[in-house]
Every structure is written in structure tokens, then in C-alpha cells.
Amino acid sequence: METLIYAGQARGCQRITSPSICSVVKRRALQFFLFAEIALFLPAAHLRAELSSGATYSLSFVDMDGNKVSTADGRVTLLVLVAAADREKARAVGDRVPDYCLGNPDYRMITIIHFTGKPTAIGRKLITALAKRRVNEEAKRLQTRYDAKKITRDARTDIFTVIDFDGSASSQLNEPAQSASFRVLVFARDGKLLAQWNDVPSAEQLAEVLTQSH
């Protein structure tokens, strides 16, 4: 209704003797239509409120092996949020972790695989089985780094992967349910957020933050 009024007022400007009144009416009509146009794109816009660096967060997750992990349990946490299609990015982050973090109980990497769809119960089982197989493959790759550094530890026990079907994990990062964003965050032992990126950080960037956290 307000749109029709503005439109009618705008057309009637030619019959208004005061140029200032006509200008105001046109400006209000333009503002209204611009607002309506922007509103159409808001659902697809980047609406999440990112976590604040320097703030403390106690975020809790359960990985695919049933391990309960937290960002404030006394370990430095490198957390990666990734969509299933971007798992190579998660691998790239892992490959850039400094060697002194490998097998070190003071450090931990958690990967959250976020699914935007709603798979069926059977679909979840298949996805979980596939994810476990890929995690085991990644463990073999990581084991080669352990062996090269003479770290006598099973690399598989140091891989923590959370399969987020319902958005309960990603929502703790203020991530919208249908978002497929990629994020990397580093938390100190007490859960203080030290750094965050929306792309794969360089090895130098990771090393700098992880060194400061120690």
C-alpha cells in the first residue's frame, strides 16, 4: 500500500508547485525501493556474527570416535570448519601444522565437517563410514610424519573429526545452518580465541600463532 502511495506521489510531483516537496517525495520513494531490493538479497548474504578474537569460548564437541573435546580443556586447539566438498583445504591446514605440534599432547587439531543438507538415517551411516575410511587414510599420511620425526605414537589417536549433520557443532561458531563457509580458528588452553581465518593460513601464520599460544 505504501508503495502505491509513493508511486502516486512521485507521479503527482509534476502537479505540485513546490520543487522542494517534489524532491522529498521522490527521495522517499527511491529509499523505499532500494530497501526492498536489498532485502531480497539478505537471506543469501554473509549474515553470521564471527567470534571475537581475544574473547574466551568454551565450545564442546563429540567426534566420530565418541571423544568429548573442548576448546577450553587445557590444550591449544586448532579448529577447522569445512564443508564436505572442501576437505582438501582441511588437509592443507594439517600439512602446515609445525612439526613441534605433532604428537604433542599440548596441541590438538579438530576438524568439523559441516553438511548443509539433511541426509536420511541410511545416508548418515554411509557418510559416516566413508568419513572414517578417509580419516584412516589421513592417519596413514600423518604417521609418515611421525615416523620421520621418530614420534612413537599412533597418529590415528591424534585425529579428531566431528561430523556435523544437524548444525549443532557449527552453530557454536555462529555459522548459519545452510552456510558452507571454510574457517580456521586457534584457541588457547583456556579457550581464548587467538586468531581466525576464512581461508587456509600460511605455514608462517600458523606457526606464529601457535608459538605465541605456548
Predicted regions and their residues:
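Sec/Tat signal peptide C-region and signal peptidase I cleavage site
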Residues: 43-49
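A short, polar/charged loop-to-alpha-helix boundary motif
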Residues: 201-214
